[in-house]
């Protein structure tokens, strides 16, 4: 079910006091869609979203209906602000946890998630806590292809800093705390679409 104080004009849709409930998810916040009428022809790239998620729990199974990359049976607990069109949006002040005890706080930009072009994710983390095995549960198709399995040896990892990931490269500039110790790293991997041959 969806309820909101709804307003519509030729340039904006407003959904204030927004509440969305599905069988496995719930979300509270506000949403604005800003556009020119011609923008609907290229909805993914032109219609700009301005969304505040005050609190939500979102089923990965339900997200897979839109973006079939998430692991099954997970639930994300999230509060954030989202700005931009669906194919080039940013989360600001993201606070996200899940059933596998991963925790993300920071700002993340997503490009081309709904496109045939190479995707790119650029993140500035105040905190990213997870393990390789937890990440596989969250994004199994992406993580298994993009990150080498040797990272699993690090165990639980807490990261502060910048990470940029695309179809073909991984750039990391961060401070990481792991089960094996602490490391300040600046790393660039290319050719990660063939992760075992990455350099």
Question: Language-model features: where?
Answer:
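Charged (often Lys/Glu-rich) extended helix/loop segments that serve as interaction or gating elements
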Residues: 51
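Outer-membrane beta-barrel translocator/channel fold
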Residues: 56-62, 128-139
């Amino acid at each position: 079910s969806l309820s909101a104080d709804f307003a519509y004009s030729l340039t904006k849709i407003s959904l204030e006091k927004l509440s969305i409930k599905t069988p496995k998810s719930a979300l509270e916040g506000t949403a604005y869609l800003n556009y020119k009428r011609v923008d609907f022809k290229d909805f993914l790239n032109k219609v700009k979203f301005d969304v505040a998620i005050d609190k939500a729990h979102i089923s990965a199974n339900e997200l897979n209906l839109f973006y079939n990359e998430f692991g099954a049976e997970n639930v994300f607990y999230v509060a954030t602000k989202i700005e931009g069109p669906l194919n080039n949006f940013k989360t600001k002040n993201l606070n996200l946890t899940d059933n596998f005890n991963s925790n993300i706080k920071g700002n993340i930009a997503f490009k081309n998630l709904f496109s045939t072009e190479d995707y790119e994710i650029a993140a500035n983390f105040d905190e990213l806590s997870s393990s390789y095995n937890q990440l596989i549960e969250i994004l199994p198709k992406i993580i298994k292809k993009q990150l080498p399995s040797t990272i699993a040896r690090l165990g639980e990892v807490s990261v502060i800093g910048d990470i940029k990931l695309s179809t073909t490269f991984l750039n990391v500039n961060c401070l990481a705390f792991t089960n094996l110790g602490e490391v300040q790293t600046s790393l660039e991997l290319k050719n990660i679409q063939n992760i075992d041959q990455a350099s």
